[in-house]
Amino acid sequence: MAARNEIRPIVKLKSTAGTGYTYVTRKNRRNDPDRLVMKKYDPVGRKHVDFREEK
């Protein structure tokens, strides 16, 4: 059961707009070994911005 968590860990995506809004998602470490960056909607800033993975 521990292998499942190692391959696809849960990560937080924090808004780069500085609003403090976060999304929670899973990522595959084999396909994305670097920090994840996704463009998503920030409801606090009311626009689409980049969300970066935080540790």
Curated annotation (Swiss-Prot):
| Keyword field contains Calcium | no
One GO molecular-function entry: structural constituent of ribosome
Q: Does Ribonucleoprotein count among this protein's keywords?
A: yes
A Gene Ontology annotation in the biological process aspect, one of them, is:
translation
Query: Gene3D superfamilies annotated for this entry?
Result: Ribosomal protein L33
Q: Which UniProt keywords apply?
A: Ribonucleoprotein, Ribosomal protein
NCBIfam families assigned to the protein according to its UniProt record, in alphabetical order: PRK00595.1, rpmG_bact
The similarity annotation says: Belongs to the bacterial ribosomal protein bL33 family.
Q: What is this protein called?
A: Large ribosomal subunit protein bL33B
**Organism from which the protein derives:** Rhodococcus jostii (strain RHA1)
